[in-house]
Amino acid sequence: MSTVITILNGPNLNFLGKREPEVYGTETLEYIEKSCQDYAKKLEFMVQCHQTNCEGQLVEWIQEAIGMSAGLIINPAAYGHTSIAIFDALKMFSGPIVEVHLSNIHRREAFRHHSYVSASADAVIVGCGHEGYLFALEYIAKQLRYGYKKRSNQTLLT
């Protein structure tokens, strides 16, 4: 069986391609998921993709990924700026974690500049559009192949 990488997408990402294409691009979530599946296959991994508009469901999927997935990619969308529950759940995951945002959150409204998720992620990719997911897959694949070591859960949240 192939090694699994879980990809989680948060609220409103089911409307990609329709919602603010000047910010998020014209690619649909289905296109992004298919691109990730195809690229993961080339990297000899398998991906499981999920999307929800509900914070609690994201937490449950993170918990399910513990012990089942080798790596995790999360685009928490707006929950990145507000969810301590997602931050806490991610801290329990022992594999590499990459936070992805399609847009550059640091060039947008001030309330989007901070992400709780970033404090529990090994890497953060912003502003690269749908290709950010592919970069995240590449990063996780390299980490897993070359001896990933979990970083300290100590954070600098203030």
Curated annotation (Swiss-Prot):
Highest rank taxon of the organism: Bacteria
Which chain regions cross the lipid bilayer?
none
Q: Which Gene3D superfamilies match?
A: Dehydroquinase, class II
First and last residue of the signal peptide: none
Could you tell me which pathway this protein works in?
Answer: Metabolic intermediate biosynthesis; chorismate biosynthesis; chorismate from D-erythrose 4-phosphate and phosphoenolpyruvate: step 3/7
Q: What molecular function does GO assign, one term?
A: 3-dehydroquinate dehydratase activity
Q: Please name the catalytic residues of this protein.
A: 24, 101
Q: Which GO terms describe its biological process?
A: amino acid biosynthetic process; aromatic amino acid family biosynthetic process; chorismate biosynthetic process; quinate catabolic process
Whether Oxidoreductase counts among this entry's keywords is: no
A Pfam cross-reference name: DHquinase_II
Q: What is its EC number?
A: 4.2.1.10
Q: Where is this site: Transition state stabilizer?
A: 19
Note the InterPro entries from the entry: DHquinase_II (IPR001874), DHquinase_II_CS (IPR018509), DHquinase_II_sf (IPR036441)
Q: Which catalysed reactions does the entry list for this protein? A: 3-dehydroquinate = 3-dehydroshikimate + H2O
The record's section on PROSITE patterns has: DEHYDROQUINASE_II
Q: Would the keyword Lyase turn up in this protein's UniProt record?
A: yes
Q: Which keywords are on file for this protein?
A: Amino-acid biosynthesis, Aromatic amino acid biosynthesis, Lyase
- Binding of substrate occurs at 75, 81, 88, 102-103, 112
- Cited function: Catalyzes a trans-dehydration via an enolate intermediate.
Q: Which family does it belong to?
A: Belongs to the type-II 3-dehydroquinase family.
Report quaternary structure and partners: Homododecamer.
Q: What is this protein called?
A: 3-dehydroquinate dehydratase
| Name of the gene this protein is made from | aroQ
